[in-house]
Amino acid sequence: MLVVLAAAACAPAHGAAYEAAFGAAARDEGAGRFEAAARGYDDAAKRATRPRDADQARWDAAVVTTRSGNVAAAAGRFEAIAADATSEHVAEAAYRLAALRIESGDADLGWRDMEQIPRRFPTHGVGHAAVRRLVQHADEQGARAGLEELHALERDLGATELVELIAFATAEHLEALGDDRAARDAFVRIADRWPYPFGAFFDDALWHASLLDEKLGLYQGAIEDLERMLRQRETTSLVGSYERQKYVPAILRIGELYRDRLHDRPRAREAFHRLYAEFAHSTLRDEALWLEAALWHDDGDADKACGRLGTLVREFPDSRYVPCALKQCPDLERARNSAAPPECHDYIARMTESPSERDEQRDGR
């Protein structure tokens, strides 16, 4: 009870008239009565006792006017907010005004306005959105035009936080243009300049660098890119491992690169086993055991292969690999309550083939 009273005491006093008007406007908006909602928000702005509340009501009126389809009125509202230095919505209003002009037939003025958004508001979220939109617009004329737009943005914004986004998009464009070596080097520079945990593109940059290293025939370099990413892996006693999106694909690719590109089967087995042993929350742990067992089997060590498959059958009784494991190792037994498929499917066996073997199968050789 005391907590509730304390929270109520700390709540801002909006004023009864403002709250009534704002609530009525919100109900009109929810019911699709957008013109009435805009008038209601205008009324709330007049009744506000705090400048911040009035500012929010004016913003909501502009947004709901856009929803009403009255483009001219919405543009006028956003323009007024963008010109009000006291508003908390200046940057958002400027962006929405530019976007509205682009989408409603005044594209030339809209794109000129959009060009100024990241330059005026480099630390605001709309700056990031504007950069992406400007590059996407330039890309309509081809990747080379997009790259030129990025170079122009870098000249003006190289000292701002937007330069990281610009650098990553530049590397992507170099890759799209087929300049693999320059793109690879650009991605590595991003990881160097903005390392984890501060770099927003650290993982993605190393992932792209690894793909390009593989394409360039630099297989060990491709592995090192991925291992560099995985060295930043964090653990916590509360929720297990903190797994970012690229971690599991990275360790899986390491195994595949050792197996298929470097033909280093022991290290491939080690990588696949790491996926099983170290990534406790991954849904690919059963696949990792299957891939590791396949390498033991191909090397003629049936005991090790069946040992790994036994772990698979015990720990993952519902896995799609269970019937294939039982087929390879007849001494293994399916769990009584297993929901695994009844039969081993051929596509699972093909998962262990190298790229050249898959090509031969496809070409009928």
Describe the predicted segments one by one.
Residues 6-365:
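Acidic, polar-rich low-complexity tracts and alpha-helical solenoid repeat scaffolds
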Residues 1-3:
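Sec-dependent signal peptide recognition
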